[in-house]
Each structure stands twice: as structure tokens, then as C-alpha cells.
Amino acid sequence: MFQLGKSEKAFEEAKRYMPGGVNSPVRSYRSVGSNPPFISSASGSRIYDIDNNEYIDYVLSWGPMILGHANPEVIASLQEAIPRGTSYGAPTLLETELAKKVQAFMPSMEVIRLVNSGTEATMSALRVARGYTGRDRIVKFVGCYHGHSDALLVKAGSGLATFGVPDSPGVPQGVAENTITLPYNDSDAVRKLFDDIGDTIAAIIVEPVAGNMGCVPPEPGFLETLREVTKAHGALLIFDEVMCGFRASSGGAQKRYNIKPDLTCLGKIVGGGMPLAVFGGAREIMNQIAPAGPIYQAGTLSGNPIAVTSGLATLSILQRDPTIFKQVEDATIALCEGFERLAAQYNVPVVVQRVGSMFTIFFTDKPVKNFDDAASCNEEQFKMFFHHNLSHGIYYAPSPYESNFVSICHKSSEIERTLAVADEAFKKIGDTLKNSDTLKNSDTLL
């Protein structure tokens, strides 16, 4: 029988030592009105908590584990590397090898800098854009999350959306004034802004596939508009592919939609589950970074051999067997088509949105194209779906504003089990809707 007694005790203790008991807000389960399971181990498509519950995992550490948890080849490479030392603070051959592999997947990244997190990657890319153009203003889109640096915590998605906070206290007004926000997928708003002040803008930064208000793909022509206006006005186009890199396709969203950005930020999969991210782009731009140029960026643990080893092993597997990308996308398609079929069977209004191997179930009857659309979805129905699945061994992101992910370890048996539990959840929601309609009709008759 499903129970979380040990996890609840562990959470109470954690709250004495960490803000809210967690090290990233969405993990607190506050948005679904419960307490989180504390995870003890993971393998393949499964994770296990300290209460001995087993789950089929669609969070996958928020995206990185495309090969599944504890991939034997990745683990073996780490076991071999660790005895040689965990950090040198000096150049290694591994860094160059990783840069070569990243460039092979994404040729737009001619020169690459390794950092420790997606936040560092986007923060550094913005500094490079400002230094290169000599301009201060940046454009981002409402609901797109680019990490927690001050300039980008303005109308962000992800955890901020989960907690209903449009902006974070502690971001100086002077910093926020240089961040212009527009609705995602609104090409007309982009054109108008650039017609008015385009020559003062350093860069547009965008999730080419939004993943932090749920999975929201770009509308036809949207990314093309961004590329067109930035080129016309001497601004840079930055693709934040921290989430959708290696998910949208083998070459990320830029390959899937055939758009070449000036700078790209990658994380998650590129580190194979270790703290590693990269940013890179055109040689002329990246060579403005110290020591090649005047724009400063540095990090004590950047390029540390353990994280680089994990990333190198992961990308080597993906490079050796490119069919992995089709396999995970095919599994995601089967899963999403199953969700749509079951929801329709029980008359539950649902829109399932997918790009590559990332997906979100939106409890709404219309496509989600931007943050306002995402925010109008039915959160109570999401909570019902989430809790039924969790208690029956299916682990989804505990927020309606997040993407879920599929790995190479999610085989047909996992998909079948997932859909069987989803069938029960949608039936429960459908029955609730039916009873609600019956009650309304009774009230009308009275």
C-alpha cells in the first residue's frame, strides 16, 4: 500500500536546515498540496523512495537522463575517472573532446565555454551579447525561464509560475528595466518592438521550445521572425536549449526548425546528470571572452573532469547510436496519443503537447501557445491526475507548468503500465465532471 511516512518525517527535518526543506522550490510539492517523496536510488526508467515505493519516472532529474538513470557505461566512466581526482582547476584533454562532440551535434556552436549550470550559461551568454553589441537591453518572453540570474527573473516560468510569483524580490529595478518582456509566440509584438527600439537591443533570448510553462512549441514563423529582426537590427539571437537541446532532435530545436542562432546555451543532457552546462556560438562573438577578448567569465569548477566525463560518456553514446533520438520520440508519441485517446473516452478536456521526447498534459480544451494559455488550465484536475498517478507508481513533474520527459529505458511495458494508470485517473476526473454537471442540472431544475 502506498505510504510516505518516512519521507514526511525526512521532510520535516529538512525544513529545519534548508528553506522550505528543499534546494529548488518545485521539489517541495507545494503546488500540488502535498509533501514530496524522498528518493533513495534510481535505475533505468525507475526511481525508488525511502518508503520503498517504486515509480516509473517521467521527470528524469528534470530532463538530463535521456539514457535512463545510472546508465552502465556512464557509471563505468565515472568510476574510472574519480580515482584520478575530482577537480584540477587546470586544462584537460577531456574539455576539448566534449567541445568537439557538442559542435558535431550543433555546428552553430563554433567556439564553446564550459560552465556549471544552465543559469551560468544564460547569464554569461547575455554578458557576451551586451559586450559584443555595446547595448544593454535584452528581450525575453513571458513564461520562459532562463535560470535565476537577476536579469532573467522577470516574468519567468518554471518555479515562479508554480508559486504564482511574476517576478522575484531582490531583483534591482535598474536591472529589470533593461529586460523587456513580450508574449511568447507573438511575432507581431516582436516586430513592433524592433521597429520602435530595435537598434538599442543587445539580444533576444528564447526557449525555442518553451518547457517551463509546460511544453509549448513555437508557432510557424515565430522563430523565423526572431532571426529576421535580430539580423536586421544588429542584435544577437540566443537560443536557450538547456532543456530542449537533444530533446527536440539530435541537434536541438535549431536543427528541428532549421534556425541558426548566434549563441546557444545547453545543459541537462550535455552533463549526463552532473552539474555541467555550455554556451557557445559564432567564433567572432565567442572570441570576445577572456582571455581571447575583454569580456570576463570564469569559474573554479568549470570543466571539472568528473562532470565532463559524464557528459562525454553520454554524448558518445548518443553519437554512436543516433537511433536513440527516434526511439525516445516514438515512445513519447505512443504515450501522448494514449493520453489523448483516454481523455476523450472519459470526456476530460485535455490538450497534450509534445516536441521530440518532452511533453505536457494541459487540462484545457484549446491549444496552449503562451503563458496566459497555460495559466488558464484547470489546476484542480491536474492535481487529481498527479496524485492518482503518484500513488500508483507513476512519477510526473509536480507542477502544471513543467515538461515531462521520456528516456531510452521507457519501453513498451512502461508505456502500457503508464497508460493503464492514466486510464484510472482520467476516469476519476471524468466521473467528477459528470457529477458536477448532474448537480448543476439539478440546481437548474430547482
Residue ranges and their predicted role:
Residues M1-N435, L439-L446:
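Conserved N-terminal phosphate-binding loop of PLP-dependent enzymes in the Aspartate aminotransferase
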